[in-house]
Amino acid sequence: APCCQPRTVAALAYNYKDLVVRVARTDDEPLVFLKSPACLVAPHEPIRLPAWSERVWVEVALALVIGRPVFEASSDEAARAILGWTIANDVTAANICGRDHHLARSKSLVSFCPVGDILRRGIDTAALRMTTTINGSRTQDGCTRDRILGDAEAVALVSRIMPLLPGDIVLTGTPAGAMSSLITPGDRAELEIESIGRLANPIIRRGSR
């Protein structure tokens, strides 16, 4: 099972410099969006693709797990609120007519947030290598040092919008390469973050077994 049972799953978009230089200005604040807690699945559970979407991709993300209530926090307060870290897969479906890919129809489908089953504590996350591999082919290869906002700053940003409670998760974004990480039924996606661990899930069509 996932290492926590969040009531809120918040996530940052455009928080990696190698991605932002292609789509936005590097001085823009990262975007914050939500994923439904109902879309969490454990390692090795299938990612189920909807029949209506022809383009679905995976995104490796370092996930922060909250250990104490936090709201409108400073960076120092946010840092103290972090219980630990795990790995997450921010699965995304291309939206209708190519519209905003951070809406519920893209981000919150059933099974669209695999989360690791191990919570890591007491580690330095400043420069961790993170990769995505699909059927043995590497599609993402980045490092947490390239984030615009680090752990504490990410939690502080989200806390200015909404309260975070123990067990909640903040996904801190994904590096470049997501558009090369398209998945289809029969594929296997394996994500890995140095010092955190691996997260592997098979891909099936929704409605199949």
Feature-to-residue mapping (PLM):
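Catalytic-pocket segment enriched in acidic/His residues
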Residues: 2, 19, 25, 94-209
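Ligand-binding beta-strand-loop-alpha-helix segment within the catalytic cores
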Residues: 60-62
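Short helix-to-loop capping/linker segments positioned immediately adjacent to catalytic or ligand/cofactor-binding
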Residues: 51-54, 70-75, 117-122
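Extended, compositionally biased flexible segments
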Residues: 1-58, 198-201
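N-terminal accessory regions of nucleic-acid-interacting proteins
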Residues: 71-85
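Short catalytic-site patches enriched in acidic/histidine residues
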Residues: 31-48, 70, 111-116, 171, ...
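Hydrophobic beta-sheet segments that form the core/acyl-binding groove
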Residues: 45-52, 66-70, 132, 186-193
